[in-house]
Amino acid sequence: MTDDDRIKLEPSWKAALRAEFDQPYMHQLREFLRQEYAAGKEIYPPGPLIFNALNSTPLEQVKVVILGQDPYHGPGQAHGLCFSVQPGVPAPPSLVNIYKELQRDLNLPIPNHGYLQSWAEQGVLLLNTTMTVQRANAASHAKKGWEFFTDRIIQVVSEQCPNVVFLLWGAHAQSKQKLIDGTRHLVLKSVHPSPLSAYRGFFGCGHFSRANGFLQQHGMAPIDWSLPPL
């Protein structure tokens, strides 16, 4: 997001979000990130992957939205899709619990990796509400402006896409429910899949089968939640 490292944005999102790039919050966010890079701080995900969720899932293809909070802050993990890690990196604990629920819900095998790109390419928008983070410093880029931008993304999906399933796991994701038109979309809520909370209702929530049932009910192809081996 620096001036010399222009980030490409998929055309349908660029059109829908064009006005956001002229907002005061975006100028402040750009300046904050410029200073972080100038100070030599290591920022995740790498610049070209910051908008990977949008570039992997064009607006008109969105069927399911999963909200995360901010990117993983360990080296080599984050690549712009919430809950997902790059190939060769072990699946983090919350993602392992997502896999356990998929196995219980849809009888899918537990994948040997944590790379969720195939979900994104089928129409699952894997959106972190804060899109960057400093290495080893969780939530270091929270409340710097990203939330305005990602709130608008959620609103745009709610306004422009038909019959979307929103999966809101945990209090932070559920705080975004006010941005979603519940008369047009299916909103499914549970506790976060973190090991701290998954046993209080994430396991057994059945969100993946319920999402596919809703999509099929509205004439859309279901998501193949199984992941190809790497």
Curated annotation (Swiss-Prot):
User: Where located?
Assistant: Cytoplasm
Where does the source fall among the domains of life? Answer: Bacteria
A Gene Ontology biological process noted in the UniProt record is:
base-excision repair, AP site formation via deaminated base removal
One Pfam entry for this protein is UDG
The record's principal subcellular location, in a coarse class, is: cytoplasm
Q: Identify the enzyme class.
A: hydrolase
* Entry GO MF terms: uracil DNA N-glycosylase activity
Keyword DNA damage in annotation: yes
**Entries under InterPro entries matching the protein:** UDG_fam1 (IPR002043), Ura-DNA_Glyclase_AS (IPR018085), Uracil-DNA_glycosylase-like (IPR005122), Uracil-DNA_glycosylase-like_sf (IPR036895)
* Reactions that this protein is recorded to catalyse: Hydrolyzes single-stranded DNA or mismatched double-stranded DNA and polynucleotides, releasing free uracil
Q: Which residues act catalytically here? A: D70 (proton acceptor)
Which UniProt keywords are present, listed alphabetically?
Cytoplasm, DNA damage, DNA repair, Hydrolase
Give a short account of what the protein does.
Excises uracil residues from the DNA which can arise as a result of misincorporation of dUMP residues by DNA polymerase or due to deamination of cytosine.
Family membership, please give it. Belongs to the uracil-DNA glycosylase (UDG) superfamily. UNG family.
Q: Which NCBIfam families match?
A: PRK05254.1-1 (NF003588), PRK05254.1-2 (NF003589), PRK05254.1-4 (NF003591), PRK05254.1-5 (NF003592), ung (TIGR00628)
Query: What is this protein's name?
Result: Uracil-DNA glycosylase
Gene encoding this chain?
ung
